[in-house]
Amino acid sequence: MNENKGNFANKKMIKRAVKDSFIKLSPKTQMENPVMFLVYISSILTTVLYAVSLVGIRDSKSSFILGITIILWITVLFANFAEAIAEGRGKAQADSLRAAKKDVEAHKIISLEKKDEITKVSSALLKKGDIVIVVAGEQVPADGEVIDGAASVDESAITGESAPVIRESGGDRSAVTGGTTVISDRLIIQVTSEAGESFLDKMISMVEGAARKKTPNEIALQILLISLTIIFLLVTVSLYSYSIFSANQAGVVNPISVTSLVALLVCLAPTTIGALLSSIGIAGMSRLNQANVLAMSGRAIEAAGDVDILMLDKTGTITLGNREACEFIPVNRVDENELADAAQLSSLADETPEGRSIVVLAKEKFGIRGRNIRESNMEFIPFTAKTRMSGVNYNNSEIRKGAAETVKDYVISRGGYYSKECDEIVARISNKGGTPLVVAKDNKVLGVVYLKDIIKQGVQEKFADLRKMGIKTIMITGDNPLTAAAIAAEAGVDDFLAEATPEGKLEMIRDFQVKGHLVAMTGDGTNDAPALAQADVAVAMNTGTQAAKEAGNMVDLDSSPTKLIDIVRIGKQLLMTRGSLTTFSIANDLAKYFAIIPALFIGLYPGLSALNIMNLHSAESAIFSAIIYNALIIVALIPLALKGVKYREVSAGKLLSRNLLVYGLGGIIVPFIAIKVIDVLITAIGIV
């Protein structure tokens, strides 16, 4: 999925785009873009005018008509090329995905109870609800849910990520994708999609653009462009009638030529944005694909650009996902070294990230090295949900660590004393957003291990940037309100939802939407599905359940919760690019007006030469220069349309001011300079 990332295009893509540019000359394809269809019709009209001029029926020189005709056809081809090069990126990605989509032999069974009764069938014949067995070395034949077993799966063909992932029955890691490969153990999978409707099929369809529909914003902009084009068409027709009247009044034989008026119409029509509009939308989808995010619709990308509420999971997005030991706090005058030694002993067999961090902290702070856990006199007590403690029996002593209330009951049951000091330390750590683990030896409390949520580096700056953009961030966590408040304050989020439930998340999203906000969120579990279905931008993790993926309108193939921030940036960049190029395109008309209008009427009204502020060489050179610029600017802006306008984390007001300056004022100045340069060049080489 990361193919061509960061590249404008390669030779193969350019070659295919050139070929497609000519294929797109069919009337059916041209009619899909009304603005460029006008240029297409104009090209046909001038071609006919040139043909009849060869037999003596003309209102301009044949060479002039031929020149305008060639430039108009080149303009149409450039517009086709812009769209084809954008589509080419998607086709290149689709080709790599098709390579992963192979018809393989599937081992179908009737039920879990009859695992030995295997029927070999083609993966293309599998239906929703079928059960298959996939062993190490085999490709997963279809999308499904793991209903038995656990295995490492290579998903690089889909995600581009070489590291294998674990897929297992139950929980939020049960979804598997057809085209991935099992590299260890065995999975029993229930198929969840019909043939041709798999996740891979949807990906191919989306990246190729076959399933892409115009978004409401695109439709609204296209209506504006069509309206402007109709206005300019009426103006041009009126000018022709006016030129006939003026010619008769002045006693001049020839009014303005039809060819010149066609050139005027094409120059005044918003052809630049008309040619690039489709490319901008396709490129936005492509940038998401390059970020390993699959958008189910262009509407979702646009919504991401308008989002003003971001609901972010604490774990994995704001924090690293694992709490780490950061301090040993002894009580009852216990030596800190003794507490660290006991805490490390109780954690030697603890393979959780928290347990390993205790071992590391004791080593770093006191130089206490881990002992051999295979010593015969060590009996490790594993953590269970029932006991809420873990520990070790060692040298006739019982060392335990766990939740405060559990350890308190343990100590008191053995005739020990649980001090008020320990309660105060536990409360203080909880208020800071940390997790206290109390450590006891036999019937004596030694102290507390402070486990802290580690805030990801740089998230405070990211949230500050989002705030500048007018986006409110809300942290979603299952922690208690005190812990949630402390972490939210440290991370710099605007608000939080503590002890979050599926119902609570859904209610919060609805409340914001009623107030007119657009909400984005991420999720991976079945319990996230209702909220994902309600959110305007819903990013489901690829590692998540099938229900979550179906509820979301985007799927993150990397399963990175922080990707939501990048998605919002891409959405805003898409909207900015479209707006900036629209502004530039319309601003261009002013310069082209000063180039062509004096050239058209200077024969009838010599006084209009005062409007020739660019001092263009002649009427013909003015028209040629304007229409050549009109074609070249399309090609010049293709890289910007594909890469997008550079996005900055500033307020909408500042962005608008900057873009009006760059693309509004720039859209006026650039054509004045370019048209003058073209006029000098074509005059120097004798074209006119």
Curated annotation (Swiss-Prot):
* Organism domain of life: Bacteria
Q: Where does ATP bind?
A: 350, 354, 383-390, 401
- What GO MF terms are annotated? ATP binding; ATP hydrolysis activity; magnesium ion binding; P-type potassium transmembrane transporter activity
Its membrane topology is listed as: Multi-pass membrane protein
| Similarity-based family | Belongs to the cation transport ATPase (P-type) (TC 3.A.3) family. Type IA subfamily.
The reactions it catalyses are: K(+)(out) + ATP + H2O = K(+)(in) + ADP + phosphate + H(+)
Q: Which PROSITE patterns match?
A: ATPASE_E1_E2
What name does this protein carry?
Answer: Potassium-transporting ATPase ATP-binding subunit
User: Which GO cellular component term is one of those annotated?
Assistant: plasma membrane
Q: Which residues form the active site?
A: 313 (4-aspartylphosphate intermediate)
Quote the subunit structure annotation.
Answer: The system is composed of three essential subunits: KdpA, KdpB and KdpC.
Matching Gene3D superfamilies: Calcium-transporting ATPase, cytoplasmic domain N, Calcium-transporting ATPase, cytoplasmic transduction domain A, HAD superfamily/HAD-like
* Free-text function comment from the UniProt entry: Part of the high-affinity ATP-driven potassium transport (or Kdp) system, which catalyzes the hydrolysis of ATP coupled with the electrogenic transport of potassium into the cytoplasm. This subunit is responsible for energy coupling to the transport system and for the release of the potassium ions to the cytoplasm.
Q: Which Pfam families match?
A: E1-E2_ATPase, Hydrolase
Entry keywords, A to Z: ATP-binding, Cell membrane, Ion transport, Magnesium, Membrane, Metal-binding, Nucleotide-binding, Phosphoprotein, Potassium, Potassium transport, Translocase, Transmembrane, Transmembrane helix, Transport
Q: What is its main location?
A: membrane
- The residues that the entry says bind Mg(2+) are 524, 528
